[in-house]
């Protein structure tokens, strides 16, 4: 793999504050997303992902404020997702300093959103966020992986592999593949899911969900991911960005 593997911390932001515990002794306020993003920038993160978990219109301006303040201190690509429903939402986030914008539920409800955003701003701006899991109960998908919404609580019955292929055709520039089964388990990424998606799409895949120790990261790249994303292992200080990069390098992967 010639391109450098990207290591991306993810910050879940609720009403302007980071949620999921954060333990950094050197931060005045571990709940402030701008301070935390700056800390990860100092640690050598390749990108930062913000997920607006409130994502209601009432908090949209709060997120715009967070992004614009972060852009003044952090000089690596920033992706912002959560509650993005229209090309106008994308426009306002790009104007305040985001480099890429993540879409999820709105694209499931109206797939034309993908092509409208890609046509207006370019494919490189659009990250399709997919919360997928092994099917449960009544749902039967061809691949055995289905797309969920509402943080994995709501089944859609949509085949996850079919959906990523369709999104690529419509103009998505990248897939943020989050395994709802692995999420929070700290038992490693869902390698089978990554392989299944890699077989079907050419665009970059960001693997998310399940990172618990440094050894979890190289297998995700081996399975076909181009980047790795994690939240709690970084927030709790279990691992640093440098730890992950050193492990990837040890396995022969290029890192920045």
From Swiss-Prot:
Query: Sorted alphabetically, which InterPro entries does this protein's record hold?
Result: Aldolase_TIM, His_biosynth, HisF, IGPS_HisA/HisF, RibuloseP-bd_barrel
Q: Please state where this protein is localized.
A: Cytoplasm
**Matching SUPFAM superfamilies:** Ribulose-phoshate binding barrel (SSF51366)
Which pathway does the record list? Answer: Amino-acid biosynthesis; L-histidine biosynthesis; L-histidine from 5-phospho-alpha-D-ribose 1-diphosphate: step 5/9
Q: Which GO terms describe its cellular component?
A: cytoplasm
Q: Which reaction does it catalyse?
A: 5-[(5-phospho-1-deoxy-D-ribulos-1-ylimino)methylamino]-1-(5-phospho-beta-D-ribosyl)imidazole-4-carboxamide + L-glutamine = D-erythro-1-(imidazol-4-yl)glycerol 3-phosphate + 5-amino-1-(5-phospho-beta-D-ribosyl)imidazole-4-carboxamide + L-glutamate + H(+)
Which E.C. number(s) belong to this protein? 4.3.2.10
Record keywords: Cytoplasm included?
A: yes
Could you provide one GO biological process annotation from this protein's UniProt record?
A: L-histidine biosynthetic process
Chief subcellular location equals cytoplasm
The record's top EC class is: lyase
Give the positions the UniProt entry annotates as the active site.
Answer: 12, 131
Q: Which domain of life is it from?
A: Bacteria
GO terms, molecular function: imidazoleglycerol-phosphate synthase activity; lyase activity
User: Which family, according to UniProt?
Assistant: Belongs to the HisA/HisF family.
Q: What does this protein do?
A: IGPS catalyzes the conversion of PRFAR and glutamine to IGP, AICAR and glutamate. The HisF subunit catalyzes the cyclization activity that produces IGP and AICAR from PRFAR using the ammonia provided by the HisH subunit.
PANTHER family membership: IMIDAZOLE GLYCEROL PHOSPHATE SYNTHASE HISHF, IMIDAZOLE GLYCEROL PHOSPHATE SYNTHASE SUBUNIT HISF/H IGP SYNTHASE SUBUNIT HISF/H
Protein name, as recorded: Imidazole glycerol phosphate synthase subunit HisF
